[in-house]
Amino acid sequence: MRVLYERDGDVSIIRERVVAVVGYGSQGRAHAMNLRDSGVEVVIGLRPGPSFDAAMSDGFMPRSVQEAVSIADVAMLLTPDECMADVYAKAVRDYLRPGASVAFAHGFNVCYNQIPIGNGVGAFMAAPKAPGHMVRETYIAGWGTPHLVAAKPQCEHLRALAVSYAIANGGGAAGIIETTFVDETETDLFGEQAVLCGGLVELIRAGFDTLVSSGYEPELAYFECMHEMKLIVDVMNRGGVAALNESISNNAEYGEYVSGPRVIGAAVRSAMRRVLNDIRTGRYAKDFIMEGRSNSPTLTACRRAVGEHPIEAVGARLRSRMTCAHGT
């Protein structure tokens, strides 16, 4: 797999176009500010509200989504996945200029045919592999965020446009990898659900609950199962698992080898395959889309339960007393 850098693309391609950023959440703000700082003309498409005010505070003059799209060569859709198809149908599709392209930072709505691409409309994806605030922070720092890019239909014009956009958004410094809408979507969802969010959060809570229910102090359980997680991940992020094992004690490393597979064993791997199958068959997407159409009852209930878990109160209390938790 080839990794592209700034020298492998032409940032002037996107600089010659007007980009409408539709949405001004975490990703929308990062894209808009990075593109502007890279010399791209950016217009913001928003409804009145807090995001509208935030964009104005950042020096933009937001317009309605329809107006922003109608004057743009590229419409980058950065609204939440669950409402993007509705925004596209009502405020984007019929307002695109001839020859304009639709862009995405995640392939969900294209992969699952919520936004059909065709009838002369080209689409590309420039997906930074980090939350929005980190996309902005790494751009400012000069090392950027890795990007995945794709085009539909697959043609050199859209490919070059996607790479150019990724460079302007900071990807040229960190690396740009070509993929497809389907592969980006399926791997992204699996990583979030099985490892980065779903798997990791459940692992932390299970460890915390095991220690507390066995009679250990909640504060000790928090330190061992949550606080130290970042320290471990930072080492792995810099040098991989081998670097981690070089930095820990022989006792910790031996425990990794003999107990890790007991926790993450055959049953977990089988569950991961079932999660991936739900993603690949579209079952998860169908459930998520219906969740959004039903006013998100599962999300609401689960968010409430997360806030009520004992680890949250313990963590908040300890973090308020630790200068290291505040970056000082």
UniProtKB/Swiss-Prot annotation:
The superkingdom listed in its UniProt entry is Bacteria
Listed binding positions for substrate are S249
Catalytic residues (UniProt)? H106
Q: In which pathway does it act?
A: Amino-acid biosynthesis; L-isoleucine biosynthesis; L-isoleucine from 2-oxobutanoate: step 2/4; Amino-acid biosynthesis; L-valine biosynthesis; L-valine from pyruvate: step 2/4
Q: Name one GO molecular function term.
A: NADP binding
User: NCBIfam families recorded for this chain?
Assistant: ilvC (TIGR00465), PRK05479.1 (NF004017)
Protein's UniProt name = Ketol-acid reductoisomerase (NADP(+))
Q: Which organism is it from?
A: Tremblaya princeps
Its taxonomic path starts at: Bacteria, Pseudomonadati, Pseudomonadota, Betaproteobacteria, Candidatus Tremblaya
